Amino acid sequence: MNSNGDKLSLSVQNLANTNEITIVQAIGELKKSGKDAIPVLVEALKEEGSLCNIAAAVLGEFGEDASEAAEELSCLLKSHAEDTRMAAAISLMRIGKPSLPFVIKIAQESEGQSCFWASWCIAWIDPSCIEPKMYKCLKYEHEHPSGIVAPFAAEEALGKLIAFQLKDKED
C-alpha cells in the first residue's frame, strides 16, 4: 500500500468492517484525506450493503464539495433497499443545489419510494421546485406509510412546503 489511492481505498473498505475501532480509524484516515477521498467513496457506491450506505453517508458530510457524487447518489434512490435510499437522500440533501437536476429527474420519472425520496430531497433543497406529482407522492406516503421512517420524513417535507408557501405569501 504505497500510494495514497490505495490507502484511501483500504480506508473506504474498512468502513464496512464490524470492528468499531477499525471503522473509527478508517473515518480518521478519510478525514485526513479530505476531498481526495471523494472519488474513492463514489466508487464504493457501486458496492452492495453497508459499504455503499456508509460511503453515501460520508459523501454527504462533504456537502457541496461532493457535488461530483450527486448523479451516482441519485441512482441509489432507485435501490430496493430502504436504508440505501435513505442514506442517498440525506447525502443528496446535504450536497444541496448541485443535486437538484438529478433528484428532479428521478422524481419526475419514478414512482413509489424512488419518487418519494427524490421529492423529499427537493423539498429540503428548494421547495419552489416541487411539482404537483411530487407533492402527491409526499402526501401519499404521509397518509399511507410504507415503513417506519418514511412517514416522518414525509411530514417534515410537507412542513417545509407549507412554511415555504406561507413565507412566499408574506413577500
Swiss-Prot record:
Keywords: Antibiotic biosynthesis, Bacteriocin biosynthesis. Induction: By Spo0A and PhoP, during nutrient starvation, especially phosphate starvation. Repressed by AbrB during normal growth when nutrients are plentiful, in association with the transcriptional repressor Abh. Disruption phenotype: When the skfA-skfB-skfC-skfE-skfF-skfG-skfH operon is deleted, increased rate of spore formation; a double operon deletion (sdpA-sdpC plus skfA-skfH) makes spores even faster. The keyword Ubl conjugation does not apply. Accelerated cannibalism by skf- cells is seen on solid media but not in liquid media. Required for production of the bacteriocin SkfA. This is Uncharacterized protein SkfG.
